[in-house]
Amino acid sequence: MIRVLVVDDSAFMRNMITKFLTSNHEIAVAGTARNGEEALQKIKELRPDVITLDIEMPVMNGKETLKRIMASDPLPVVMVSSLTQQGADITIECLELGAIDFVAKPSGSISIDLYKVRDMLIEKVLTAGRVKLKGRQVPISKPAIETAKQPIVGGSDSVRFRAGKQLICIGTSTGGPRALQRVLPKLPKTLKAPVFIVQHMPKGFTASLANRLNHLSEVTVKEAENGERAKDGWVYIAPGGKNMAVGLEKGELVITLDDRDTESRHKPSVDYLFQSLASLREFEKIAVIMTGMGSDGTEGVKGLLKHGSGTVIAEAAESSVVFGMPKSVINNGLANDIKHVDEIAAAIMTYMKKERA
């Protein structure tokens, strides 16, 4: 049984979340709190397994509460966020600070539409309940030398690709935002390949993730746009709620976004992206599967290896928040290498040099 502390300043939301969670026989609500200060006291008294934490609260907000939880005695936390730009930005910061995942309120802070995310909330709490946090959670630090970077809007200037070039593709889910912050900042701005990323995330949050990663990294990171021409040293993150494919048109890699449902229940889907890349035989692919629940990416990796040459790196169990997606790739015998998240960027660069040799 997973014991949950529900933290929200709205009595309506506390009751609603409690009702949703207790509809699952594996979850019990140990208690509730109206703000962060009260939550910290309840944590000491109740010792819950998981916390659902609202972001916007009086007395002590969710972000400050999360900082204190992670600095003292870390517990798995699922943030509950509003679908606003400010809410999205703060949510990404909370994932950076150590929150396991988040659930978006569909229509603001008080909404009957929360029923739409009931199953997602239950799933994420169950997942969080299986996570064992490893000691004090240290926030991701900025690079020692950093130039001011603005959020990227609009397409990049296209660069015509030569035969035999390389591309990098990354798939991740739960724990992915924090993992990406431990990989992308280590890639050089002179990177001789584009990077395509699928991070399972709902609409409205991937732009904030891209902006944050862009701020931390030497490479340029942006949310992908339909029809955009890809460029070396640029990182393209699939928008939440859309699938991303990459094709070749007149010597240029072109991104296509669409709303079609696929065999994967995820949108964006790692399998969908990787399968589109499989047809690009002119390119050496370096595929990376990192932390996440389930097996999205496994079929896509099979396609990459079946239709062309490629190298597959899977994140090791020791650094994965949820060892699901990488485990599936490893168990299917598809991984060329298994790396701790802090070693993945170096592995990517090593394989790029090998494949160019």
Swiss-Prot record:
It is found in: Cytoplasm. It comes from the Bacteria. Residues 3-120 form the Response regulatory domain. Keywords: Chemotaxis, Cytoplasm, Hydrolase, Phosphoprotein. GO terms for molecular function: phosphorelay response regulator activity; protein-glutamate methylesterase activity; protein-glutamine glutaminase activity. Residues 161-355 form the CheB-type methylesterase domain. Its EC number is 3.1.1.61, 3.5.1.44. Belongs to the CheB family. This is Protein-glutamate methylesterase/protein-glutamine glutaminase.
